[in-house]
Regions:
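Acyl-donor-binding surface of acyltransferase catalytic domains
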Residues: 86-159, 298-310
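Conserved donor-binding loop and adjoining core beta-sheet/short helix segment
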Residues: 21-26, 30-101, 218, 222-248
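Flexible, substrate/cofactor-facing loop regions flanked by secondary structure
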Residues: 159-243
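Conserved hydrophobic beta-strand within the GNAT/NAT acetyltransferase core sheet
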Residues: 118-121, 245, 279-283
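Short hairpin/turn module used for nucleic-acid contact or packing/dimerization
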Residues: 256, 263-310
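Conserved acetyl-CoA-binding loop-helix of GNAT-fold acetyltransferases
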Residues: 93-108, 250, 256-269, 273
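A short beta-loop-alpha structural element at the N-terminal edge
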Residues: 1-16, 25-29, 161-176, 181
Length: 310
């Protein structure tokens, strides 16, 4: 096996390999939308951070990553990077070996640039890719899931009010957003978030970059919310027929009473009426509350894994 820096002349072949990998995942998750081509593969040739693998002068895989950033993945002071779904691919034969050899070369590139942590989004049903990275010290951090925009069951809490919150009323649920942040700070999530970062996030979500649906009790108090956006964490989430959940919270005293399930049903029925066909969600796999809830109604299609290089 030989290796070259991923260049523009390799992009179309890399795109074909990436598309084959996506089609494999679609066999396991038929809800995934059809695509003609994998977008933005050229980024990993343009930034000089990609590696291509060859057997007998035929490309068998590639691996790239985004430009690094500081304080990545809550490792304060560390420079880290991420390889998205469109940033890698490998043929089926010898896939474990191909990915492991690619990572060896990619890690050398990263270390030379001072990049000390590396994350990559893998397809959830690609056992060979997961084996390759798990054996090399990676652990799961996040997951993306998808479902058809179809009912999950009749609303049980008929006494609750389900509605879309107007932008001017977003401050009503600021405390719930802060409670969600506090939940993610605790064990076993331990996601770091400074007061400044929290303030910036609240300003962003209250600026109108999303739609927010809420469940209200008989006293008018908001018991739960779900944020919806038109953008996902990967190219799949940008499909025009798809909408994505980007934040969910239910006050603790009303958990286990089908409040969040009923709100999700309301959201699904609303979006279906508007013509949307797919619903996605991403979450930290270190959040057991999210893990238990979302897997009941959604199917995994990605598994994002992370490790420190040095």
């Amino acid at each position: 096996m030989t290796f070259k820096k991923l260049s523009k002349e390799h992009v179309e072949e890399a795109r074909k390999i990436a598309l084959c990998n996506y089609e494999e995942e679609r066999l396991a998750v038929p809800e995934l939308p059809a695509v003609d081509s994998i977008p933005m593969v050229e980024l990993f040739a343009e930034n000089g951070l990609g590696i291509a693998a060859f057997e007998n002068d035929k490309m068998v895989g590639f691996l790239g990553c985004f430009e690094p950033w500081i304080d990545a993945f809550d490792f304060l002071g560390d420079k880290g990077t991420f390889c998205p779904l469109m940033g890698h691919g490998a043929v089926k034969e010898n896939r474990v070996l191909i990915y492991q050899k690619l990572f060896e070369k990619e890690a050398e590139v990263c270390v030379a640039k001072g990049i000390s942590s590396f994350a990559i989004a893998l397809y959830a049903h690609d056992s060979e890719a997961k084996q390759a990275f798990f054996e090399y010290g990676f652990g799961q951090r996040c997951a993306d899931k998808i479902r058809p925009m179809e009912s999950i069951g009749e609303i049980k809490n008929k006494n609750l009010v389900f509605e879309e919150l107007e932008l001017s009323r977003f401050p009503e649920i600021r405390n719930l957003r802060i409670d969600l942040n506090n939940h993610l700070l605790k064990s076993p999530c331990f996601l770091k978030c400074s007061d400044e970062e929290l303030g910036d996030w609240l300003e962003k979500v209250e600026s109108g970059d999303r739609r927010t649906f809420v469940a209200r009790g008989t006293d008018g108090k908001v018991l739960a919310y779900i944020d919806i956006t038109g953008e996902g964490e990967n190219f799949v989430g940008y499909d025009k027929k798809m909408r994505n959940i980007h934040g969910t919270y239910c006050v603790p005293e009303f958990r286990g009473q089908n409040v969040i399930q009923d709100l999700l049903e309301h959201v699904i029925l609303t979006l279906k009426t508007e013509g949307f066909e797919l619903l996605g969600v991403d979450h930290e796999s270190t959040n057991p509350t999210a893990n238990r809830f979302w897997r009941k109604y959604f199917t995994d299609y990605t598994c994002s894994v992370l490790r420190k290089i040095f």
